[in-house]
């Protein structure tokens, strides 16, 4: 057992890879406060704007985005255009 309380997410965002031609990414807010989602979207796009999903920097920035979402209590869903294996 852990003493960590898991709070419900404040918002949900989908991060979608659009393809190899810029812009590569789009972020859609599914639910939650609009300002929270807009600020999160701005940070996500700043990290991904010039990266394709195959760029080595993408993996590091993806982990940073996941940590940011956890801090902000935003659940995220990635659509990279292929099935991911964990």
Predicted segments, located by residue:
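Short N-terminal "domain-start" leader segments
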Residues: 1-26, 35-39, 44, 56-86
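Solvent-exposed strand-loop boundary residues in beta-sheet-rich modules
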Residues: 31-33
């Amino acid at each position: 057992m852990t003493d960590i309380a898991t709070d419900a997410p404040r918002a949900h965002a989908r991060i979608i890879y659009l393809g190899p031609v810029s812009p590569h990414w789009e972020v859609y807010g599914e639910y939650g406060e609009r300002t929270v989602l807009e600020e999160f979207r701005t940070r996500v796009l700043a990290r991904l704007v010039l990266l394709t999903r195959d760029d080595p920097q993408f993996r590091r920035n993806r982990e940073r985005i996941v940590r940011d979402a956890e801090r902000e209590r935003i659940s995220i869903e990635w659509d990279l255009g292929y099935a991911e294996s964990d």
